[in-house]
Curated annotation (Swiss-Prot):
This is Histone-lysine N-methyltransferase SETD1B. A motif (RxxxRR motif) lies at residues 1788-1793. Residues 1-20, 594-605, 1001-1011, 1341-1352, 1541-1551 have a biased composition (Basic and acidic residues). Histone methyltransferase that specifically methylates 'Lys-4' of histone H3, when part of the SET1 histone methyltransferase (HMT) complex, but not if the neighboring 'Lys-9' residue is already methylated. H3 'Lys-4' methylation represents a specific tag for epigenetic transcriptional activation. The gene is setd1b. S-adenosyl-L-methionine binds at residue 1933.
Length: 1956
């Protein structure tokens, strides 16, 4: 805007009025003559806005023509039509919530090109003591102000101190103070000479004199004048005085301005200082309340330009407004002194504009400020743009309240317009703007005429910051304008490209100033001032000051009368807005937008109309702050909707500057935020009709005629991002506490928060601060807003309100942004690739070593197994498991412990899954292949880290995992077989042992589970793993682990679990061990489930645990279940080892009894849902169940093994195990039952096979095995994966009473993975009660869960509801679980195709033995009752739809004869056949089936819990009917041979899960479908199909059963126990996961989702902050694949929803690689390693590492390494990994010692050398406490092991002597020469290895030995003793005694004191 020089009075008036209510006279732009400047006139007119339509400065000979409020004209017959519809041209919504953009203002370089008075900030020191250095001098000067540069001059020839120095202060005040206080003072004995040396001329003169030798530093002639006072040009002094006034006004507050080098000098200096307003970013500029005086504003002292540049538009406004305010006071004199200074003041007024608006704030010189209202164009205006424009809008009064905001806006504007000199209007504007000290309420803009001088004075006083040039008259400013504009434009261009923040501030200023340039056209005086003098500083120079020069700015929030108006032809307001320096409309709009935004915010902050001056001061400082505060404040501020709308429109239009030619059009401004009235979309601003704004501000990319929006001031919208960053950081820092967030994260979160607030329609960035205010939460907040506010270049067509925020929203981005981004992307990608490569390499190495060790261990174990299958296998398995556990533990430890589980720890985007996955690069997945080999199973497990196993096993669990699980289970079985040697005396003991083996198995299982779980949720998997590992290590550990992972759940559940555990303990030690696992799992599980599980646990603790675990994580559950099942099996097997036959008999009896009772009680219980106390049924049934379970465990295991045998790897292992497990499977008490299941699995699951060995039908000792399966299934199942038998027993809901007559082939009853509660619900309790009870009891128990145990566990989840309760009573399923009853008619599934072998004892399914899960035919064994019963999770009705759940999808090759609902497990055998027939079990098998049915109940209940989790897995195995297994006996043999491998068990579990899933309507179907893959892939005999779906039960079961048959029952029991324990561990882990997932599972189970969704853990609802923290943590830690996956899923789901999320429609999902790369980089950073500029240390070359940094990472690394072992020890999991490593190392060392003992000493050394070379010790060098660097062990080293070879150059003595001298000359004090013998010396000085770092110690832990290898002598360092991790490697140098002693620093007790 151009203004005639307004009279100071006018100006003061106008700005204040402008700042106040623009209803006051906003006549600053009017000539005094045209409109009286009197307040009366103001009152009469109540103009809210004005526009300078004609500016004589632009049109010669014409009078200034102002249009007020779009209707009135300053001249009666203007000939210009009034505006049709008067409204605020500014798009207010854009500015509603402006956040301060902290745009670092580039510092103006004071050089020959500098235009205007140079700010006297440079001080020259002379006669300094030559000891004074930069630091000293800088410290000496800092007390007087911020020091930007300190330079001491030296003689270039001799580098001697010349005694002269240059100190550049950030502020003139600081420089003056320094001169004042330091001149002629004594410093270091010298009286120093200090003077202001603005251009350094004096210093250069001194320098020349000194360098030329004319004087010495002490004789240097320093003029008295120099001494007396710093030489400052008058102009600089004037500027300085002006500055001082500014500074004094601002001075009190420490602001970047004062501290900033240019703060006082000019807007440029402060804004250009590059120091963003300290307060500008998001903090209010006032650094406190938005109303804080500008003094507090960072740039308040500086000019608005600086503030503006530093800050977003508001910042400008704030600083300018603030400063000008203060400056108004101080500069009033200066300004009055020089009319030209009006312009300068206008610049200041830019800030002054804020002051003007601050007129709202109490300010003595609001009148002066009003001059700045013209500045309203400038940043001040911008800031107040909203309300001013709103004021301009038809809302005079309404806007008045807003106008206080406008006042702020005016301040901003004022800042620009204040250069009234520049504007011909300035005078008028000032007069008009002369807002009378109505400071807070310049309701009516004074007529343009009013005190323009005053206003100018105000502007000037405001501008004094810019008044670096204050002395320069406006003309001078004009003269400087071109050069300054050009220069500023160049600077701004640079800044645009370089600093978005700067651009933001500059943009406002530049825009204003650039607009000012046109405005300066309007007022040539102002115009000359560089448009970029955004701040008041360069008022003369800056167009911005020109805008500020007008009272106009103050008068009108949108300085209509700006030069823009003049630029524009009179005819059209729009065209005027466009053409005239868009600044007036646009600038006004923009500035108004800014001002309004800032004002809104300020007002909101300060109150609608705090005294304008105060408010403006505060407002501007708070402009950014206000913008931020205004987020909250905007709503509070009484902005009338009309105002808001108008403001929005005007602001938006203003905000949406027309992109300058050559710049891409600005994107449309973001829609106004909801909640704020949006002004009607302003018609798109017509292109600037005339670049009347003849002076296109060079910085302004916008067309010269179109002044860019203030906010748009800089073409680079990017500025807003930086501003956002700063603001976001500030805001977030405030809001989010100390949470470390990356800028992006802060920005995103702040944006989200802002969006959520939606308090103001104006975008923050539009406001010139952050774009977080974007209207739409998901709208890119920064781009358009940045563009709008940050880019001056897209000037709005004057104030075409039509320009919507969208255009404003997206401003031109930095032209180099794409390039920079591309380069950054490339670099980031490369760095990530490098990091990934390094990580992968490291991981591969680690994995390779580990795999090798494991392979070695496995081989050893296999060898030992062949010798001593039980012991060696066990120990090795344990070792492997431990190793794996360690790995997993270490991986999981931090996460599971909950230490790293926080958002920070996990990285929010990464999650536990990501965390675990990262360490375990799938490289470790060698198990599946190994799993294929029975012998390799162990190896497989070790080879896979738990994480890897979990990750991939879970993924591949159905198929590859099945094999691996089988192999794991085989290994476990081997361990279990070995385990029998150990009595399961104590729960912990057994569990620990089982856990050891199961640990491996669990690892495998976990790996498979985890893979699945990763799909479901790696968190659960992790917790499962952790729990699993904990279980392995011990129940206590497991409890700890789980408790850490799920302490809450444990707390609530522990009691239940404890009771369960106690009852379980009573029942059996195995139960106890299971109990502990279960306890943990239970704790993890929901209490309700826990209670059910407790009851179940009382009967079947393991099953309960499994069920719970399944509930948490079906994948992990499956693994755990396998482990748990193995453990139970082992326990059961081992406990009743002796009485296997008896147990079998008992089992048969129990089966019959249970079948009967189960049928009755199950119905009863299902009705009751846990009516029957579990304890009773458990206690009574436990023994029976144990027997049954063992009986069934063997058959089931056999079946499972057969199924697994079908799987390649499991078969082999099983076969290996077969011999071991040939022993009869002893029935295990309740706890043993699950274990028995595995043995059962060992035996063929065929009806006869399952009970082939056992013989007797499974019978529960208690006639009634009453287990409330449904409830347990629902709760416990979800929470606890159940052991097949235990689940059955545990399911109180379905009291499983095995009727003596009832026989169920173990395979008949698939251990269905139960949907957490879905399946349970599926089967009506009534229906389930009778048939399902028997079925469940028999099926679950009969069905061995080891392979099928997963099924059992899953089935138990399902099983509770599925088997007896939940499972629809398929004819066979509902039928009492007689042998046939066990046909796994998916009990949960109504008429599930697979029914238990035969619901009635008499029915036999063609005698085909079946795998517990697979054997189940989908066709109802008996259509009678079970077939009809759909399995519904409690409350769910069976629906065919449910089948969409994968397991239920389709019973493979199973006819869904039962109900339309496919049975959970498709059976190969005909669906309808006797259960025996289906399972192919003889009577014995049926009996076993009964036991498995019993187990199956548990499993079902477990499965019910896991239903969702495992549905898919289970359905895979279950749904696929397995081909008939070999006869029961054969399978028994096989199973005996081979204990259920983890995979088998997992497969069974999966199968069970599938069954359970199938049973659940949809969930069952879906899970069945999922599970079916195994079955489908190879449907084997039901027996052949392992219940464990992880392993392809098909092959593995087939193979395993024979193996199992061969395996002694003891081994089977051991295996089973191991499996059970493993499952238990898994269960625990799953439980912990399930506790989280169970709730979701329950939900899912209850409402099976059409699509199978992984179980979700239930967490306490996160706060919005937490959500956002997680959401935006991707900015900190990147986003991992998992998060991307889920984000994509969420995106897809959201797209399918009609939530009005329009942004989604505009969002296109584009694949992007994960950005979450866990790399050592962070650790290194943490360790103190510096960040490399290039991003890669390798590219940095050699550089010196600071000792401090070294100490940091030395200490940190050492402490970390030391702590890690401690943590590891403290945590069983970590300890185990270490132990496993240690164990391997010890074994190796033992082997070496053995070998060495066999061979001679020489050979021994050589052997040790080779072996150690083969197995390199992990060492590292770090700072040593002994001397400099030292070598430290990173792993425990056993005594007499080779640590490292001393490597170096092999040289002769002569060379060594020469080198020693040379080294001494070179300053290499350390000696790295090691004498090998008399002739040879190894010199490691220049080349060598880490051995060179080994320090001497008088009490060393190593010794050096010379050995000969291949005729070469080598120095090898051997360990003398056991060396712990992080212990320094030392040896005795054994230097010869010499006269010159070398002190010894070893610090040993027996230290000799010297090395020699």
């Amino acid at each position: 805007m151009s203004f005639k020089e307004a009279k100071p009075g006018e100006r003061g008036k106008n700005p204040e009025d402008h700042g106040r209510k623009q209803t006051a006279s906003w006549i600053n732009g009017m000539e005094a003559g045209n409109q009286p400047s009197t307040s009366g006139e103001k009152k009469s007119h109540h103009w809210r806005s004005y526009k300078l339509i004609i500016d004589p400065a632009l049109r010669k000979g014409q009078h200034k023509l102002y249009r007020y409020d779009g209707l009135s004209f300053s001249m009666p017959n203007s000939g210009v039509p009034p505006v049709d519809s008067v409204r605020d041209p500014r798009i207010g919504r854009i500015w509603t919530k402006t956040k301060e953009l902290d745009l670092p203002v580039p510092k103006l370089k004071i050089d020959e090109f500098y235009v205007g008075p140079v700010p006297p900030k440079q001080v020259t020191f002379a006669k300094l003591n030559d000891n004074i250095r930069e630091n000293f001098l800088g410290d000496m000067c800092k007390k007087y102000g911020e020091v930007e540069e300190v330079e001491i001059l030296y003689n270039p020839k001799n580098k001697k101190h010349l005694g002269i120095a240059k100190v550049i202060f950030a502020s003139v005040k600081g420089a003056r103070d320094a001169v004042k206080h330091l001149h002629n003072t004594s410093v270091m004995g010298n009286i120093i000479h200090v003077e202001l040396d603005t251009k350094g001329e004096t210093r250069m003169r001194f320098y020349d004199l000194l360098v030329n030798g004319f004087y010495t530093p002490q004789t240097l002639p320093v003029g008295s004048d120099l001494d007396a006072s710093p030489t400052v040009n008058e102009t600089p002094q004037v500027v300085e005085s002006v500055k001082r006034t500014k500074e004094t006004a601002i001075g009190p507050s420490v602001t970047p301005n004062s501290s900033t080098p240019f703060s006082h000098d000019t807007a440029y200096s402060s804004s250009r200082q590059g120091t963003p307003n300290s307060y500008s970013q998001f903090t209010p500029q006032s650094q406190g309340t938005p109303h804080t005086p500008r003094l507090g504003t960072p740039f308040s002292q500086d000019s608005s330009y600086s503030s503006r540049q530093t800050t977003p538009a508001f910042h400008y406004g704030q600083d300018s407004g603030f400063k000008p305010r203060r400056h108004e006071n101080k500069f009033t004199d200066a300004y009055n002194r020089r009319p030209g200074h009006h312009y300068v003041h206008s610049s200041g007024s830019y800030r002054g504009t804020e002051h003007t608006f601050n007129v709202t704030r109490p300010q003595p010189e609001p009148v002066q400020v009003p001059r700045t209202p013209p500045l309203s164009h400038s940043s001040g205006n911008y800031k107040s743009a909203f309300s001013p424009y709103q004021g301009n809008t038809v809302f005079p009064q309404t806007d008045e309240s807003q106008y206080p905001q406008t006042s702020r806006d005016m301040e901003y504007r004022r800042t620009g317009p204040q250069t009234s000199d520049s504007y011909s209007d300035a005078g008028c504007n000032s007069a008009s703007l002369e807002l009378k000290p109505v400071k807070e309420k310049p309701e009516e803009p004074p007529p343009p005429e009013p005190d323009s001088t005053t206003e100018q004075k105000a502007s000037f006083s405001q501008t004094p910051e810019r008044c670096e040039t204050p002395g320069t008259p406006t003309l001078e400013a004009e003269l400087q304008h071109n050069s300054l504009d050009t220069r500023i434009a160049m600077l701004l261009k640079e800044q645009r490209t370089q600093l978005h923040l700067i651009a933001g501030d500059q943009n406002s200023d530049n825009e204003i100033r650039m607009e000012g340039s046109p405005i300066s056209s309007s007022s040539s005086q102002l115009s000359p001032i560089p448009p970029y003098s955004s701040g008041s500083r360069y008022q003369d120079v800056t167009p911005s000051s020109r805008p500020s020069s007008t009272g106009l700015e103050d008068i009108s929030p949108t300085p209509l009368p700006d030069s823009d108006d003049d630029d524009e032809p009179i005819p059209g307001t729009a065209s005027l807005c466009q053409n005239s320096r868009s600044a007036s409309p646009i600038d006004q709009i923009n500035q108004s937008g800014r001002k309004t935004e800032s004002l809104d915010k300020k007002e909101l902050v300060a109150g609608d109309e705090t005294p304008t001056s105060e408010k403006m001061d505060e407002g501007h400082p708070s402009s950014g702050e206000d913008m931020e505060i205004s987020d909250d404040e905007v709503t509070p501020s009484p902005i009338t909707s009309a105002e808001c709308a108008i403001t929005s429109s005007s602001v938006i239009s203003s905000v949406i500057p027309i992109p300058p030619p050559g710049f891409p059009p600005l994107p449309p401004p973001p829609p106004p935020q909801p909640g704020f009235p949006m002004p009607p979309p302003l018609p798109p601003p017509p292109p600037p009709t005339h670049p009347s704004v003849t002076v296109p501000p060079p910085p302004l990319p916008a067309p010269p005629g179109v002044p860019p929006h203030h906010i748009l001031h800089h073409p680079p919208p990017y500025h807003h991002f930086p501003v956002m960053q700063g603001e976001m950081m500030n805001v977030l820092g405030n809001h989010w506490g100390g949470m470390t967030m990356s800028f992006q994260m802060q920005t995103q979160m702040l944006s989200r928060m802002m969006q959520g607030q939606g308090s103001y329609p104006y975008h923050h960035f539009m406001g010139g601060s952050m774009q977080f205010g974007n209207q739409h939460p998901y709208r890119p907040f920064a781009i358009s807003a940045h563009l709008t506010r940050g880019q001056p270049w897209p000037p709005f067509p004057k104030f075409d309100p039509s320009v919507p925020p969208p255009g404003y929203e997206h401003k031109k981005e930095d032209p180099h942004k794409a390039t920079v981004d591309g380069v950054l992307q490339v670099i980031v990608k490369e760095l990530k690739a490098i990091m990934k490569r390094d990580l992968n390499r490291k991981m591969v190495e680690v994995v390779a070593f580990r795999a090798f060790d494991e392979w070695w261990d496995k081989k050893e174990r296999l060898a030992k197994q062949s010798l001593t299958p039980v012991k060696s296998g066990e120990s090795k398995e344990e070792d492997k498991q431990k190793t794996k556990e360690h790995i997993t533990s270490s991986l999981l430890e931090s996460w599971n412990k909950g230490e790293g589980l926080g958002f920070e720890g996990i990285g929010l985007g990464i999650g536990l899954r990501g965390a675990i996955r990262l360490p375990s690069f799938k490289v470790k997945r060698k198990e599946p292949p190994d799993a294929a080999l029975a012998g390799d199973q162990k190896r497989i497990r070790p080879s896979h880290s738990v994480d890897d196993e979990d990750e991939e096993s879970e993924r591949d669990r159905d198929i590859s995992s099945t094999a691996s699980d089988l192999s794991k289970k085989d290994a476990d079985a081997v361990n279990n077989r070995r385990r029998p040697a150990r009595p399961l005396d104590s729960e912990g003991e057994e569990e620990v042992e089982s856990e050891g083996d199961d640990g491996e198995t669990s690892d495998k299982e976990d790996s498979s589970s985890e893979k699945e779980d990763q799909d479901d949720g790696s968190v659960s998997a992790l917790s499962s793993k952790k729990q699993l590992y904990g279980d392995k290590e011990g129940d206590d550990e497991d409890d700890d682990t789980q408790s850490s992972g799920k302490e809450e759940d444990l707390v609530s559940e522990e009691e239940d679990t404890t009771s369960v555990a106690s009852s379980r303990a009573e029942m059996d030690s195995s139960d106890e061990s299971e109990e502990s696992s279960e306890y943990e799992s239970s704790s993890d599980s929901d209490e309700k489930e826990e209670e059910d599980d407790e009851e179940e646990e009382l009967v079947f603790g393991d099953d309960q645990s499994e069920d719970q675990d399944l509930g948490q994580e079906y994948e992990v559950e499956t693994d755990r279940e396998e482990d748990f099942f193995r453990e139970n099996l082992s326990e059961c097997s081992s406990l009743p080892k002796a009485g296997d036959v008896e147990l079998e008999d008992e089992m048969q009896k129990v089966e019959e009894d249970v079948a009967r009772q189960t049928t009755q009680e199950t119905l009863h219980l299902r009705k009751k849902n846990l009516d029957v106390p579990l304890v009773e049924s458990k206690e009574c049934k436990q023994d029976t169940l144990d027997k049954v379970e063992k009986l069934f465990a063997v058959p089931m295991q056999e079946e499972v093994f057969k199924e697994h045998e079908k799987a390649p790897s499991p078969m082999n292992e099983e076969e290996e195990y077969i011999e071991l497990q040939l022993e009869p499977v002893p029935l295990v008490p309740e706890g043993a039952a699950p274990a028995a299941q595995e043995p059962v699995i060992i035996r063929p699951l065929t009806p006869t096979g399952a009970f082939g060995e056992t013989g007797p039908v499974l019978k529960l000792e208690e006639p009634k095995l009453q287990v409330n399966l449904t409830q347990f299934a629902t709760e416990d199942e979800e929470l606890y994966p159940r052991t097949p038998g235990r689940d059955t027993a545990a399911h109180s809901d379905t009291e499983v009473t095995f009727q003596p007559g009832l026989k169920v082939a173990p395979s008949s009853l698939p251990f269905l993975p139960s949907h957490n509660k879905e399946e349970e619900c599926l089967l009506p309790p009534e229906k389930h009660a009778g048939h399902l009870t028997v079925t469940k009891m028999l099926s679950e128990e009969d069905l061995p869960r080891t392979p099928g145990r997963d099924i059992v566990v899953k089935s138990s989840h399902l099983g509770k509801s599925q088997s007896t309760e939940t499972v629809p009573a398929t004819p066979g399923s509902d039928a009492p679980l007689t042998g046939s009853s066990l046909t796994l008619t998916s009990p949960h599934i109504p008429g599930s195709p697979f029914s238990y072998l035969s619901q009635s004892p008499g029915i036999i399914n063609s005698g085909i033995p079946r795998t517990p899960g697979r054997d189940f035919n989908f066709t109802p064994t008996f259509p009678e009752s079970n077939s009809i019963f759909p399995c519904h999770p409690s409350g769910k009705k069976p629906s065919v739809d449910e089948p969409d759940e994968k397991s239920f999808k389709e019973p493979t090759s199973a006819s869904l004869t039962m109900n339309s609902v496919p049975s959970p497990i498709p059976f190969a055998s005909p669906p309808r056949g006797l259960p025996h027939m289906d399972i192919r079990l003889g009577a014995d098998d049926l009996e076993s089936s009964d036991t498995p049915a019993y187990l199956s109940d548990k499993l079902l209940s477990e499965e019910s819990e896991c239903e969702f989790t495992k549905v898919h897995l289970t359905s895979t195995d279950e749904s696929a009917p397995s081909p008939p297994l070999p006869p029961a006996e054969k399978r028994k043999g096989d199973r005996s041979k081979k204990p259920l491998s983890a995979h088998e068990f997992e497969t069974e579990k999966n199968y069970e899960t599938s069954s359970a899933v199938a049973m659940s309507e949809g969930a069952l179907g879906k899970q069945m479908f999922i599970g079916q893959p195994d079955a489908v892939s190879g449907i084997k005999d039901p027996a052949a199909v392992p219940l464990d779906f992880r392993n392809d039960s098909l092959s593995e079961n087939t193979v395993h059963e024979p193996i199992i048959q061969k395996v002694p029952l003891k081994e089977l029991e051991n295996q089973w126990n191991e499996v059970l324990k493993e499952e238990e561990d898994i269960t625990k882990h799953k439980k912990s996961r399930n506790s989280r997932h169970n709730n979701r599972y329950d939900e899912f189970s209850t409402v099976p989702s059409p699509e199978f969704s992984p179980p979700r853990a239930m967490f306490k609802p996160r706060s919005e902050f937490e959500e956002m923290t997680i959401l935006y943590d991707i900015w900190n830690g990147g986003i991992d694949d998992e998060d991307i996956k889920y984000m994509c899923i969420t995106y897809d789901r959201l797209l399918q929803q009609d939530n009005g999320m329009d942004w989604l429609n505009d969002t296109l999902w584009v694949y992007h690689p994960s950005t979450s790369v866990y790399s050592p980089k962070k650790k290194k950073r943490d360790d103190g390693l510096r960040e490399h500029v290039t991003g890669c240390a390798r590219s940095e070359g050699y550089y010196k590492i600071d000792k401090k940094d070294k100490l940091k990472y030395l200490i940190n690394n050492r402490s970390l390494t030391e702590e890690l072992p401690i943590d590891t020890q403290g945590k069983s999991i970590p300890a185990q990994p270490q132990a496993s490593t240690r164990a391997g190392s010890e074994r190796r060392s033992e082997q070496r010692r053995l070998l060495s003992s066999f061979t001679g000493s020489c050979d021994s050394d050589l052997l040790k050398f080779n072996q150690l070379k083969f197995r390199k010790k992990k060492l590292r060098f770090c700072k040593s406490h002994i001397h400099d660097w030292g070598l430290f062990a990173m792993e425990p080293i056993i005594a007499d092991e080779m640590v490292i070879e001393y490597v170096g150059q092999n040289i002769r003595q002569v060379i060594a002597d020469m080198r020693e001298k040379r080294y001494e000359d070179e300053g290499i004090g350390s000696s790295y020469m090691f004498r090998v013998d008399h002739d040879t010396i190894i010199d490691a000085t220049k080349c060598g290895n880490f051995a060179r770092f080994i320090n001497h110690s008088c009490n060393p832990n190593c010794y050096a030995k010379v050995i000969t290898v291949e005729s070469q002598k080598k120095i090898v360092i051997y360990s003398k003793q056991y060396i712990n991790v992080n212990e320094e490697i030392t040896y005795d140098y054994k230097f010869p005694i010499e006269d010159v002693k070398i002190p010894c620093l070893c610090g040993a007790e027996n230290c000799r004191g010297t090395l020699n």
